[in-house]
């Protein structure tokens, strides 16, 4: 066995262990949900059942909790989280793409400063971002008086979308930067020399090239928003 072959085998084993460690708890919890046993566990396995999705478990105070299918609060929370995630994707992807494109156009001396400012939101704790968003928009709503500004400034879903977008757009920015680093700028120059406008170059050359990054950043933004807690718990009023 060659050293290269041995390295590939060891790498495969390492990756398998890594993903097993990462997704193992999720797999165990998913399997446990279909065990009809009173105590949530894989062993002893009584029988495959949808019991806990329908009737739920008994709480410590003796009351029976609603099952997954009947838990209205869970349904409302899921729909709200989905709506917020879609809103964050709608804002974060264009913001990240625009910032990455600007980064490639600014002067080299300003590029480091612009890059540092663009990634700065991820350095702040989510708690700080959530509280800051609420405080800022509360002041704006107070100064705006009655009207749409006042309503938006006290709308939890709106504030949560803005708060999450502050740092999730940075993730999108980094994805677009990585993609643009491999972009051949001579394609734009050739198109401009042939009479294409800046809009045509952007739509027909740059956007198709960035489509993989757009898809990746949209997925990352959706997942980051859907599982976020620190920012959401302080901004969702």
What are these regions (language model features)?
Residues 26, 85-97, 101, 127, ...:
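Hydrophobic positions within alpha-helical transmembrane segments of bacterial inner-membrane proteins
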Residues 78, 103, 120, 178, ...:
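Short hydrophobic faces within alpha-helices
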Residues 1-6, 83-118, 131-138, 185-187, ...:
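Transmembrane-helix boundary motif in ABC transporter permease subunits
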């Amino acid at each position: 066995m060659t050293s290269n072959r041995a390295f590939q085998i060891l790498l495969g084993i390492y990756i398998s262990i890594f993903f097993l460690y990462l997704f193992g708890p999720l797999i165990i919890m998913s399997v446990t949900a279909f065990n009809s046993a009173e105590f949530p566990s894989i062993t002893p396995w009584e029988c495959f059942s949808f019991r806990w999705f329908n009737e739920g478990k008994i709480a410590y105070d003796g009351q029976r909790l609603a099952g997954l299918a009947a838990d209205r609060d869970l349904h409302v929370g899921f729909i709200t989280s989905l709506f917020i995630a879609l809103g964050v994707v709608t804002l974060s992807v264009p913001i990240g793409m625009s910032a990455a494109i600007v980064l490639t156009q600014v002067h080299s001396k300003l590029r480091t400063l612009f890059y540092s400012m663009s990634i700065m939101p991820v350095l702040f704790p989510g708690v700080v971002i959530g509280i800051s968003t609420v405080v800022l928009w509360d002041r704006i709503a107070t100064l705006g008086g009655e009207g749409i500004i006042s309503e938006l400034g006290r709308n939890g879903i709106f504030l949560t979308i803005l708060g999450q977008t502050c740092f999730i757009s940075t993730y999108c920015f980094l994805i677009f930067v990585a993609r643009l680093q491999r972009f051949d700028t001579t394609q734009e120059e050739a198109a401009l020399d042939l009479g294409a406008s800046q809009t045509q170059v952007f739509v027909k050359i740059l956007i198709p090239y960035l489509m993989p990054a757009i898809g990746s950043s949209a997925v990352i933004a959706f997942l980051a928003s859907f599982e976020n807690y620190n920012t959401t718990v302080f901004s969702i009023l």
